[in-house]
From Swiss-Prot:
InterPro entries assigned to the protein according to its UniProt record, in alphabetical order: bZIP (IPR004827), bZIP_sf (IPR046347), TGA_domain (IPR025422)
Compartments, as annotated in UniProt: Nucleus
Name by which UniProt lists this protein: Transcription factor TGAL5
Pfam families: bZIP_1, DOG1
Organism classification: Eukaryota, Viridiplantae, Streptophyta, Embryophyta, Tracheophyta
Gene Ontology CC entries for this record: nucleus
Entry-linked SMART domains: BRLZ
Stretches assigned to the bZIP domain: 126-170
One MF annotation (Gene Ontology) recorded for this entry: DNA-binding transcription factor activity
Length: 437
């Protein structure tokens, strides 16, 4: 049954083929020499293998052995031709399969070249090695960047150290370390840094005031003048930030005012200027003011006075509670150690509130300046900053004049007590001197 089906399929296949010449032999195929024993035919294509087999068989067939008078022999020959064609097809398929590994190796080489790279000596690197080399290059690049940043940081620190040394010398020459704080070693590191930063801030403030004065004299537009005014406002914000840092590190250095000039310390209120007094001084300098501006400035002055009074009362209560904590209990030499420790712990807890009061005072000063900026025009605000800067400059100049006054006459007459007549003359001269007040 299987043979008949194969015969039927081959007959159908032969029906579709065109007629061929009867050149096939009648003897069995076992007498034919198979040409596929050569290794070169295996590597060839299917069409070339089929052509070589056909030519070899054509050379072996003799024309005298053909029989054309029998239809059965013709069918056998056609079946034989189908068998040979099938053989040739299988032979070409085997050759294709044999050549497949070489093609796969070639494709693998292409994939390796795709995912790898070639070194200078011509050797091919795989993807893992290339990735490791890329990671090493990236790590080396980051290391160089860190080294460069470290060198720049060292250079910046060296320059900053030189600036601090120069500012220390300038501070010593100006007498900024009087009294018990005659040397920076007697102060905390935060106090020394604030003194240096405050000296730098004064220098920058002088430059800012000079720029603002030049802008007003040149009659610059409000846009350009407003940029300079905003820069001055940021300059004061920087000062308040420095004071906040000092309050958190050494509030006693801030409240004593040793960073300020001697004449400035006479007018300090909670380690700074009193906002209501500054507003009272600035209002006459701003004529003419509109009615709305005048009402705004007076309202700001009144609210500042109320806040100042509240802060002063709170600070007084803190001082009283601190004195009660320190002076509580017996003060003799035989005091109880446990009682002493408890009193000191209570005093330390209340002393921590001292920082908040000075922070609130600085917040009041900062808010007063910003609120004044919203009330006034750009040119009026510029004149306010100039007035504040000139006022502080005069106080510092007065301190320098007082420190550099001649003292020989005072030393010569230090041990001489005045007589009655001389005392009357001194009293009369003092009355004439202060008669204007």
């Amino acid at each position: 049954m299987i043979q008949s089906d194969a015969y039927t399929e081959s007959a159908g296949y032969l029906a579709a083929r065109p007629p061929t010449l009867e050149i096939f032999p009648s003897w069995p195929m076992s007498h034919l020499q198979e040409p596929y024993s050569n290794s070169q035919s295996v590597g060839s294509t299917t069409d070339s293998s089929s052509a070589q087999n056909t030519m070899s068989q054509a050379e072996l067939v003799s024309p005298a052995s053909m029989r054309s008078d029998s239809g059965q022999e013709q069918q056998q020959q056609e079946v034989l031709m189908v068998t040979i064609d099938d053989y040739n097809y299988k032979q070409g398929l085997g050759a294709a399969i044999a050549t497949a590994p070489s093609f796969q190796q070639h494709a693998g080489g292409l994939d390796m070249r795709k995912h790898g790279s070639t070194r200078k000596d011509g050797k091919l690197l795989d993807a893992k090695t290339e990735r490791r080399l890329a990671q090493n290059r990236e790590a080396a690049r980051k290391s160089r960047l860190r080294k460069k940043a470290y060198v720049q940081q060292l250079e910046t620190s060296r320059i900053r150290l030189q600036q601090i040394e120069q500012e220390l010398q300038r501070a010593r020459s100006q007498g900024l370390f009087p009294g018990g704080c005659s040397a920076p070693g007697d102060m905390s590191s935060g106090a020394v840094m604030f003194d240096m930063d405050y000296t730098r801030w004064i220098d920058d403030d002088s430059k800012c005031m000079a720029e603002l004065q030049g802008a007003l004299q040149a009659q610059l537009p409000d846009g350009n003048l407003g940029a300079i005014v905003e820069e001055c406002m940021r300059h004061y914000d920087e000062l308040f930030h420095l004071r906040a840092v000092l309050a958190s590190s050494d509030v006693f250095h801030l409240m004593t005012g040793m960073w300020a000039a001697p004449a400035e310390r006479c007018f300090l209120w909670m380690a700074g200027f009193r906002p209501s007094e500054i507003l009272k001084m600035l209002i006459p300098q701003l004529d003419p003011l509109t009615e709305q501006q005048l009402m705004g400035m007076c309202s700001l002055q009144q609210s500042s006075e109320q806040t100042e009074e509240a802060l002063a009362q709170g600070l007084h209560q803190l001082h009283q509670s601190l004195a009660d904590a320190v002076g509580g209990g017996p003060l003799n030499d035989g005091a109880d150690v446990a009682n002493y420790t408890g009193l000191m712990a209570l005093a330390l807890g209340r002393l921590e509130n001292l920082e908040s009061f000075y922070r609130q005072a600085d917040n009041l000063r900062q808010e007063t300046l910003h609120h004044m900026r919203r009330i006034l025009t750009t040119r009026q605000t510029a004149r306010c900053f100039l007035s504040i800067g000139e006022y502080n400059r005069r106080l510092r100049a007065l301190s320098s004049l007082w420190a550099s006054r001649p003292r020989e006459n005072f030393i010569a007459t230090e041990n001489v007590s005045p007589t009655g007549t001389e005392f009357q003359v001194i009293q009369q001269s003092q009355q004439n001197q202060f008669s204007g007040f």
